[in-house]
Amino acid sequence: MSKASDMVRTEVTRPSPYNSGLTITEVMQRYAPARIAKLGSNENPLGPSPTLATMLQAGAEMFRLYPDPAGRELRQAIAAKYGFGEDQIILGNGSEDLLSVISRAVLRPGDSVVTLYPSFPLHEDYATLMGASVKRVTVNDDLTINADALIDAVRERPRMLLFSNPMNPVGSWLSAGDLSKVLDAVSDETLIVVDEAYAEYAEGDDYASSLPDLCERDQPWIVLRTFSKAFGLAGLRIGFGIVGDPELRALLDRVRTPFNANGMAQAAALAALADEEHLAKVVALAKAERTQVESLLRNMGFDVAPSRGNFLFFNCRQNASAFAEGLLREGVIVKPWKQEGFDSYVRVSIGSPAENDHFMAALSQLL
């Protein structure tokens, strides 16, 4: 009998399986803690807008019918909110779905992709699946983004520049000035893809979304956003891309799976988008708690990366998986990082005040 690995392309065997971490159920079954703080996936502790409750009560019809495959109403709302044309908006089953769509549409065997490192693993995995090589630009020793190295890398004319800003898992970010310098160095042959999954948590500081700068440029570009984080819809899987060239958006639509944004997700995203008051509350809480948790970690002697996300990345000074195992026994789920060179680092999500207190108490027990 043929081996399963003989039936698939060689590229399929190269990425490691995605590590989503343990679920609450798995932690309860394995460790039986008195309570659990789930701080490993950067979820929103306040949840979605309260207006979704009314929508859910009327949801039976949405379950029965196919959704609008084009997501017209949601795309119109997104376009209006961000100041773009409806023909520039593409929907995805989470923004990582769009990472797959873009990679399948654009990348060819032998192409190169420049990305930041450490990275959201799927930034590399989808490129690898398409037979492209990945050029990593590692952060500085202080865990800030090395803009000069990024500029040098894009001058080699890669097929794609793909990075998150703020950066996942580190939390660091490009200032408007550094972002502009990087984009100046990119040729017209390179597709710029900026993953702004955490942009809502960063706005108002010295962070700048790439959108205003990209709008002034003729280069091909896509900015990805998600409803999973600040909007609190991680379980429904809904994200979107803003594409500079409507023709490119139309071509990506040919690669996208039909009905990739389900009806409930589209309706929930519309409600979440309209509730600006709830979004402001979510962001304010995350920023306040992030400042407090960062201060406490530093006071304990940990090196903590600067962050504009709803998470912190810190050096636990030991094997991160063993460290995270100790926290699991106390009922706290964090994300031990496993990429080479960063396996002593942990990413902890900013939760509710009670969850953050639970994390700090558990951490104190380990020290």
Swiss-Prot record:
Its EC number is 2.6.1.9. InterPro entries: Aminotrans_II_pyridoxalP_BS (IPR001917), Aminotransferase_I/II_large (IPR004839), HisP_aminotrans (IPR005861), HistidinolP_aminotransfase (IPR050106), PyrdxlP-dep_Trfase (IPR015424), PyrdxlP-dep_Trfase_major (IPR015421), PyrdxlP-dep_Trfase_small (IPR015422). It is an enzyme of class 2 (transferase). GO terms for biological process: L-histidine biosynthetic process. One of its GO terms (molecular function) is pyridoxal phosphate binding. This is Histidinol-phosphate aminotransferase 1. Keywords: Amino-acid biosynthesis, Aminotransferase, Histidine biosynthesis, Pyridoxal phosphate, Transferase. The lineage of its organism: Bacteria, Pseudomonadati, Pseudomonadota, Alphaproteobacteria, Hyphomicrobiales. Gene3D superfamilies: Aspartate Aminotransferase, domain 1 (3.90.1150.10), Type I PLP-dependent aspartate aminotransferase-like (Major domain) (3.40.640.10). Homodimer. Pathway: Amino-acid biosynthesis; L-histidine biosynthesis; L-histidine from 5-phospho-alpha-D-ribose 1-diphosphate: step 7/9. Belongs to the class-II pyridoxal-phosphate-dependent aminotransferase family. Histidinol-phosphate aminotransferase subfamily. It catalyses: L-histidinol phosphate + 2-oxoglutarate = 3-(imidazol-4-yl)-2-oxopropyl phosphate + L-glutamate. It holds the Pfam family Aminotran_1_2. The keyword Phosphoprotein does not apply. Its cofactor is pyridoxal 5'-phosphate. It comes from the Bacteria. Signal peptide: none annotated. The modification N6-(pyridoxal phosphate)lysine is found at K229.
